Amino acid sequence: MRTTFMAKATDVERKWLLIDAEGKTLGRLSSEVASLLRGKHKPTFTPHVDCGDHVILINVEKIVLTGNKLDKKVYYRHSGHPGGLKQTVARDLLANKPERMLELAIKGMLPKGSLGRQMFNKLHVYAGDTHKQEAQQPEVYELRG
């Protein structure tokens, strides 16, 4: 009888992946990056262990939203004080903080809890085409779709 393989946190080998987000759709890119951060592309995937790779996203300001989402999609945040609800349209968020838009989309696709926060820390998002992780020698990753 065979037993199910369960990876240990010490045995996980992590790679650094570089993804160019130019011209990619927000949701399709986010779901694939979330899968890479979880480690679901590896045959040794274990749900209760952080098996994912580090992901570097560049050219995030050139991301695409389909339909009328640039004008209709609204992002909310709250200061914690009464009447402190702020809202921002996707067009303004993309112009001012394009990294935040992708971070919010990916964070919502990761598990909620300490393991999800640990996975989210392996995400590195940059608006331009330069990044600070040249020393890690990331390999270019081509998306499936």
UniProtKB/Swiss-Prot annotation:
Query: Which family would the database say this protein is a member of?
Result: Belongs to the universal ribosomal protein uL13 family.
Q: What gene is behind this protein?
A: rplM
The name on file for this protein is Large ribosomal subunit protein uL13
Source species, please?
A: Exiguobacterium sibiricum (strain DSM 17290 / CCUG 55495 / CIP 109462 / JCM 13490 / 255-15)
GO cellular component terms, semicolon-separated: cytosolic large ribosomal subunit
**Which Gene Ontology terms cover its molecular function?**
mRNA binding; structural constituent of ribosome
What role is this protein assigned?
This protein is one of the early assembly proteins of the 50S ribosomal subunit, although it is not seen to bind rRNA by itself. It is important during the early stages of 50S assembly.
Q: List the Pfam families hit by this protein, alphabetically.
A: Ribosomal_L13 (PF00572)
**Assigned keywords, A-Z:** Ribonucleoprotein, Ribosomal protein
**PANTHER family in the record, alphabetically?**
LARGE RIBOSOMAL SUBUNIT PROTEIN UL13M, RIBOSOMAL PROTEIN L13
Fill in the subunit field for this protein: Part of the 50S ribosomal subunit.
* SUPFAM superfamilies per the UniProt record, alphabetical: Ribosomal protein L13 (SSF52161)
Which Gene3D superfamilies does the annotation name?
Ribosomal protein L13
Give the matching NCBIfam families.
rplM_bact
